[in-house]
Amino acid sequence: MLLSSLAALLVLAGSCRKAEEPQVNKGRLEVYKDFPSKYIPSRTVRVWLPEGYTSDKQYDVLYMHDGQMLFDARTSWNRQEWGIDEAMDSLQASGKIRPTIVIAIDNTLNRIGEFCPDDIVEYLPEGSDVYPFLTAQGNDYLRFIVEELKPFIDSTYATYPEREHTWLMGSSCGGLISSYALCKYPEVFAGAACLSTHCTLAFPRPDKPDSAVMAAYRRYLTEHLAVNSAKLYMDNGDKTLDAYYGEAQAAINASLRAAGWDSAHFAYQYFPGAAHCEDDWQARLPIPLSFLLE
């Protein structure tokens, strides 16, 4: 029963079927329903603009996954939210981060498939029981962001289109696809914040640990992400699904540091007592935002 409940977090995280649109307390949202793509099914994309947004100056851009969960607990499936609008407003108003807009990309029922990195699957040992019911579509999801969504955003809003102003953030499998994007598109993204990254790849099996599966993500990152080539933030708690991440995340940290990553480019935080949920991600949100956007 516990495993079933935890696995459901991966599938349901970010899923929302409410008709009501999220509302924000700070800034404003512009909503694009059924944003088209030739790579993945259409979906809603929301653009958060900070207070006082003007086309007279340029802004950094933060691309975030699970857009349904970012702004309004009233319209999310679990009545929790990231509170990204409040966090961004507070940090920008105090001058702690650069002026930035947020692109919130809704997920679909194929969330795990779209957030599953195709190339990492190739690092898995033969016969591994990983994502047994889905085909990895992470490459197509990233093509959507890079080839279709980003050009639209840069042509519609007053952004800095250059790499050094383009960022990613996500949690769980959203953290997985964010770090993968740094490897696939190093010329596009300058950094990623990966909260509670699902670095074990498979559904948690405490009764059947598979170190080879857990090593696949670590090996891919170490081999494909050039040392100090970007900003990478990672963290985890130790409750609910996060309880299974400690060993794999510690190995990733050790590998990156052994490769030469310094504290200006790689940051890791451990949050005792924190669970795999939006309430806990919201509580620590200023930390990764400040690391990326200071």
Language-model features: locations:
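Non-catalytic cap/lid and distal C-terminal segments of serine-dependent acyl enzymes
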Residues: 18-294
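Bacterial Sec-dependent N-terminal signal peptides
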Residues: 1-26
